[in-house]
A protein has these predicted regions:
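Intrinsically disordered or highly flexible coil/loop and linker segments, enriched in small
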Residues: 31, 64, 90-94
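Phosphate/anion-contacting hairpin/loop surfaces
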Residues: 1-57, 65
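Acidic, proline/glycine-enriched N-terminal capping motif
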Residues: 1-6, 16, 74, 143-151
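Basic, amphipathic alpha-helical segments enriched in Lys/Arg and hydrophobic/aromatic residues
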Residues: 73-90
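RNA substrate-recognition surfaces in RNA-acting enzymes
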Residues: 59-68, 74
Length: 151
């Protein structure tokens, strides 16, 4: 078990996680940021919904080269992933949108709970959400809020 865990990257939900190790892992990863985030040896615990919504929140395109991330962009991404994942643990489901006044995240219908993941249109700006295969999974991005030339 210890050897298996040693192959995992830092887990954003763990207080003892080393973000510097995650940063180094991303900088050493060839290929797209969106694919790198699904690689559990780079950062542990990120699945497709977390990838889509965290990249959206940070305005980062999934196809951007992982090694092109600046340290400031990485720091924001690390914090955002930890926040979204932590809320999901607390709520028992993934809700990335801010609930309307007077409603809790848990009251938001499942099909309205995310900005771009499995959405036809971006829930922030209304642009059609692009989707394509990346890292063996479907990637989602808003062409307005996550332009391909974002890095």
């Amino acid at each position: 078990m210890t050897r298996l865990l040693a192959r995992l990257g830092p887990d954003p939900l763990r207080e003892d996680a080393d973000p510097n190790r995650a940063w180094a892992n991303l900088q050493a990863t060839p290929g797209a940021l969106g694919a790198a985030l699904l690689d559990q040896a780079v950062i542990a615990g990120i699945g497709n919904v977390f990838r889509a919504e965290a990249l959206f929140a940070c305005g980062l395109h999934p196809g951007r080269p992982a090694a092109s991330l600046t340290r400031a962009e990485f720091d924001r991404l690390w914090a955002t992933v930890g926040e979204i994942m932590g809320r999901a643990v607390d709520d028992g489901r993934i809700v990335s949108i801010d609930p309307p006044a007077g409603r809790s995240r848990t009251e938001i219908p499942e099909d309205e709970a995310r900005y771009v993941y499995k959405q036809a249109c971006c829930r922030r700006c209304g642009a059609p959400v692009a989707s394509w295969s990346l890292g063996g999974r479907t990637a989602y991005a808003c062409p307005v809020d996550q332009p391909a030339a974002s890095g």
